[in-house]
């Protein structure tokens, strides 16, 4: 019984805002634990204003502690899982609205919580600037005289209403306020604004939810019904309209207007005249104008000297005989009346005497204190400037002063007169500033700084920075334009040259400026080299006889400058290349195929620099820098795609190749690890692997033919070669003649990760070859050591009799030939592997389950690299890897939208994942049954002891 009384007292005490705030601030004790509100995203001040207080409980159904439980002070219902109502946009109003909607969806037999319903509606109206709502069609508040609505209005006055000495007899008691359609002020009508403003308004401020007018500053002579009627523009409120409809009360002088009449004061001597009083500021602002009443005398003597004061909230005109009260109240009204117009002043004893009266009507004007919120109908008809001034005077929110705002607008307009309204980035001036200052802009420049956006973004997704050639060409064109704009006084054109050659005729000063611009990318030297070759080739074609003497001296200077830079860079690259301990070398027997002796044999492509030097008469690249080609090398073949020949000199820049193979990568212990790092090419099973090292992903040099040698001991040599090749190689797998090529274009991506890769099981000793790096073919033969044990003895029974190579590959044939030699070594293992060959599981199946998934993952990852490196789109990538992907897609997938295609792929991946998991579980289950069966049937104690020692049991 005492517990129930305590709960009831707690509920009644929670009607006060201070008590609700204390529950969030101090916390609540539950089962000898102190629990506090821990959600900083949900402000507890706003929760308390809405009517919630912190009340953590234990859920009786699940017996779990609800740390985010709150309770309503009106309906006393609890709301759980408040944390799930947090806004993803971190919008506080949206979060609070979600909490209130969740509170309203509590399923029980009780009526809906009208307090939370009303405050949610008011908060929504404030958020969307809806003004006065349509209460006519509202489900709960369409009838202001409904019993539940009246009880809600009474509930709002229970929190220390200052005029409730005797509720029934006092003219400002709770009953009078409720009957007038007023509610106690809460900040939900103002969007839960400034707390300091709430304290000033919470004293005796009331408002009507239908017309949203605030009333405060009550005096003992005020009538709540009369003030509400007048503030709402003589009954322009849904509350009075519904009273007339339901109670059949006529809105005339004998009903509500009669109650609004002003009682005479001592100085009037029985006169009951109501006149319209307007100050200078009120005449400028139409908000304070009220609709004319039906009756009232006309003022005859306009110049009559009478002391008139607007001091009472019942809108009566008082005589100057009120003495000190008149002076004191007039001083209080001075600040609000003179807010916009500084010329109007109210001094003590000197009241403004500009009194106007209509001919036959009397206009009653409320004071500034009465109207705290603008009427929507009036504000829509006024000008923007007046609306802004009225909003500043009426709204309780803090707004900057008119003079400050106008001053700031004048400053902004003065500063922005000569600027365009649209945001325009002047890249020309930016490049000039970058050249002079020597610093880069983190946004306009593709910076590679540690904290730059470009570097962080590409590192996060493991995507290389886009450094395609046409991007650099755009930079070059910008630089060229800047230089020509700066150096307008210098003659840069060759008068006698044709228009084709004029773009290469630049002066030496421009080249000096150009050399200071840093190219973005890792291989800027390659771009400079290509630029040098193009310039040299075009300069060599100029008819120098037609060039005047004035323009000829500048061309050699430019030519020599670019040549010096390119020679230095190529010399450094050449020295670095010759200092390598081991480079890619080919044996003559691998380079040629016995299929035919003509040009259809395997060919190693000649470097593109050599081809350019052969075509250009004035090449600036020294001959000693290029690697010397072998004598047997012939002219490379260009790949034929759909009947079109791709030019052999087509080259994609900025693809830096650097991939190293170490001797440890070819060890047998890393065989299982290599299965998860396989090549990203999606093609037919691998035959004799040919690693085609090329810088271009578009023009892949397809080497025809496949070397067919007899299956003898020549395949197994004791040579060991450590092959170090460069990064991002393009691996092209070829198939025998009896197999059909899956990829006809020859352009699937096979770029490896920036790590050392293992190709085969064996180790190779290093040799150095003079094969050109950027276009060479290396064929690697498998080397088997006789003493090599391919799988540890403990797991040999899981892999014997299986092959990790494709069924029709030549490596599979080599594996079969060496199976006899490996069988002798396998017999030397422990007897743990004997007698279990009948039920041994297929270990290669385990290692190959994820092979296809890795291939697809690597393929799309490399495709993304390709797109970023070359800025590939369907418009400019006619025969590249992106176009290859689209050509290989089924017709039904091409007709799908992107979202449907992604959903289809996600579903297929899910199904494949479930199938792979089932396969792995079957393999593990098989292994477990095999091992347990072997241990249970083993009778040799020594073998059991050995197995226990190996497993770490003994």
From Swiss-Prot:
Region (Disordered): 375-419, 541-645, 661-685, 798-839
BIR repeat locations: 20-117, 153-241
Pfam families given in the database record: BIR (PF00653)
Composition bias, Basic residues: 385-396
Subunit structure: Component of the CPC complex at least composed of IPL1, BIR1 and SLI15. Interacts with CBF2/NDC10. Interacts with CBF3D/SKP1.
Name of the protein in its database record: Chromosomal passenger complex protein BIR1
Modified residues (Phosphoserine): 477, 508, 552, 587, 751, 765
Residue ranges with Polar residues bias: 593-604, 819-835
Matching CDD domains: BIR (cd00022)
GO MF terms held by the record: metal ion binding
Name of the gene this protein is made from: BIR1
Function: Component of the chromosomal passenger complex (CPC), a complex that acts as a key regulator of chromosome segregation and cytokinesis.
Binding site for Zn(2+): 208, 211, 228, 237
Record-level GO cellular component terms: chromosome passenger complex; cytoplasm; kinetochore; microtubule; mitochondrion; nucleus; spindle; spindle midzone
Biological process according to GO: apoptotic process; attachment of meiotic spindle microtubules to kinetochore; chromosome segregation; mitotic cytokinesis; mitotic spindle assembly checkpoint signaling; mitotic spindle elongation; mitotic spindle organization; negative regulation of apoptotic process
Comp. bias regions, Basic and acidic residues: 556-583, 809-818
Record's keyword terms, sorted: Cell cycle, Cell division, Metal-binding, Phosphoprotein, Repeat, Zinc
UniProt organism field: Saccharomyces cerevisiae (strain ATCC 204508 / S288c)
């Amino acid at each position: 019984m005492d517990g129930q009384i305590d709960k009831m007292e707690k509920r009644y005490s929670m009607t006060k805002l201070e008590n609700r705030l204390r529950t969030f601030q101090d916390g609540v004790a539950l089962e000898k634990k102190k629990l506090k509100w821990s959600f900083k995203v949900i402000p507890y001040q706003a929760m308390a204003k809405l009517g919630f207080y912190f009340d953590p409980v234990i859920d009786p159904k699940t017996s779990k502690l609800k740390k985010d439980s709150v309770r309503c002070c009106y309906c006393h219902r609890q709301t759980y899982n408040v944390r799930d109502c947090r806004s993803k946009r971190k919008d506080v109003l949206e979060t609070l609205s979600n909490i209130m909607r969740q509170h309203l969806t509590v399923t029980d037999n009780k009526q809906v919580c009208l307090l939370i319903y009303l405050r949610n509606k008011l908060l929504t109206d404030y958020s969307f600037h809806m003004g006065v709502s349509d209460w006519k069609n509202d489900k709960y508040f369409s009838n202001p005289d409904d019993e539940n609505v009246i009880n809600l209005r009474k509930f709002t006055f229970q929190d220390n209403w200052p005029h409730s000495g005797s509720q029934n007899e006092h003219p400002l008691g709770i009953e009078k306020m409720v009957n007038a359609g007023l509610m106690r002020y809460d900040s939900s009508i103002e969007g839960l604004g400034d707390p300091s403003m709430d304290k000033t308004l919470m004293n005796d401020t009331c408002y009507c939810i239908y017309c949203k007018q605030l009333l405060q500053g009550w005096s003992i002579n005020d009538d709540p019904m009369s003030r509400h009627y007048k503030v709402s523009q003589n009954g322009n409120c849904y509350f009075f309209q519904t009273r007339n409809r339901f109670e059949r009360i006529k809105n005339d002088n004998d009903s509500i207007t009669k109650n609004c009449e002003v009682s005479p004061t001592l100085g009037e001597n029985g006169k009951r005249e109501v006149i319209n009083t307007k100050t200078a500021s009120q005449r400028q602002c139409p908000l304070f104008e009220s609709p004319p009443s039906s009756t009232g005398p006309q003022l005859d003597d306009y110049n009559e000297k009478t002391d008139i004061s607007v001091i009472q909230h019942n809108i009566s005109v008082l005589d100057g005989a009120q003495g000190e009260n008149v002076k004191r109240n007039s001083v209080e009204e001075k600040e609000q009346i003179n807010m916009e117009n500084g010329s109007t002043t109210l001094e003590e004893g000197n009241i403004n005497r500009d009194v106007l009266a209509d001919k036959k009507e009397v206009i009653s004007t409320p004071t500034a204190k009465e109207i705290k919120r603008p009427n929507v109908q009036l504000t829509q008809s006024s000008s923007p400037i007046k609306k802004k001034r009225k909003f500043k005077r009426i709204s309780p929110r803090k707004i900057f002063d008119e003079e400050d705002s106008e001053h700031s607008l004048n400053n902004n307009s003065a500063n922005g007169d000569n600027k365009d309204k649209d945001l325009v980035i002047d890249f020309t001036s930016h490049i000039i500033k970058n050249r002079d200052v020597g610093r880069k802009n983190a946004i306009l420049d593709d910076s590679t700084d540690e904290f730059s956006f470009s570097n962080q973004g590409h590192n996060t997704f493991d995507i290389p920075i886009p450094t395609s050639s046409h991007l650099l060409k755009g930079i070059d064109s910008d630089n060229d334009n800047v230089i020509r704009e700066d150096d307008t006084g210098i003659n840069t054109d060759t008068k006698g040259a044709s228009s084709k050659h004029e773009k290469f005729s630049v002066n030496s000063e421009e080249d000096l400026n150009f050399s200071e611009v840093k190219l973005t990318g890792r291989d800027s030297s390659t771009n400079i080299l290509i630029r040098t070759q193009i310039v040299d080739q075009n300069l060599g074609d100029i008819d120098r006889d037609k060039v005047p003497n004035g323009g000829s001296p500048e061309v050699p200077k430019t030519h020599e400058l670019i040549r010096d830079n390119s020679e230095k860079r190529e010399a450094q690259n050449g020295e670095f290349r010759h200092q390598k301990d081991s480079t890619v070398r080919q044996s003559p027997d691998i380079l040629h195929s016995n299929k035919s002796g003509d040009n259809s044999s395997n060919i190693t492509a000649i470097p593109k620099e050599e081809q350019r030097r052969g075509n250009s008469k004035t090449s600036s690249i020294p001959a000693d820098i290029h690697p010397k080609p072998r004598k047997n090398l012939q002219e490379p073949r260009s790949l034929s795609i759909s009947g079109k020949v791709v030019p052999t000199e087509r080259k994609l820049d900025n693809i830096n190749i650097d991939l190293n193979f170490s001797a440890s990568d070819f060890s047998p212990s890393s065989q299982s690890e290599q299965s998860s790092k396989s090549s990203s090419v999606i093609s037919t099973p691998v035959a004799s692997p040919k690693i085609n090292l090329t810088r271009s992903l578009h023009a892949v040099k397809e080497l025809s033919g496949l070397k067919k040698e007899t299956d003898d001991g020549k395949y197994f040599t004791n040579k060991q070669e450590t092959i170090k090749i460069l990064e991002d190689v393009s691996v092209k797998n070829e198939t025998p003649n009896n197999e059909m090529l899956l990829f006809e274009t020859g352009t699937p991506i096979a770029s490896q990760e920036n790590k050392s890769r293992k190709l085969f099981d064996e180790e190779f000793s290093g040799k150095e070859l003079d094969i050109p790096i950027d276009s060479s073919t290396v064929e690697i033969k498998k080397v088997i050591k006789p003493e090599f044990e391919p799988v540890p003895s403990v797991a040999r029974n899981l892999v014997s009799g299986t092959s990790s190579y494709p069924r029709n590959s030549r490596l599979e044939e080599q594996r079969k030939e060496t199976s006899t030699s490996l069988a002798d070594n396998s017999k030397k293992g422990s007897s743990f592997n004997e007698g279990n060959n009948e039920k041994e599981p297929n270990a290669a199946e385990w290692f190959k389950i994820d092979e296809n998934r890795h291939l697809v993952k690597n393929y799309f990852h490399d495709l993304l690299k390709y797109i970023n490196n070359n800025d590939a789109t369907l418009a400019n990538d006619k025969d590249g890897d992106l176009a290859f992907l689209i050509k290989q897609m089924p017709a039904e997938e091409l007709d799908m939208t992107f979202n449907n295609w992604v959903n289809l792929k996600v579903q297929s991946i899910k199904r494949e994942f479930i199938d792979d998991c089932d396969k792995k579980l079957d393999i593990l289950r098989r292994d477990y049954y095999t091992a347990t069966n072997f241990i249970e049937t083993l009778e040799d104690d020594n073998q059991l002891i050995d197995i226990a020692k190996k497993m770490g049991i003994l």
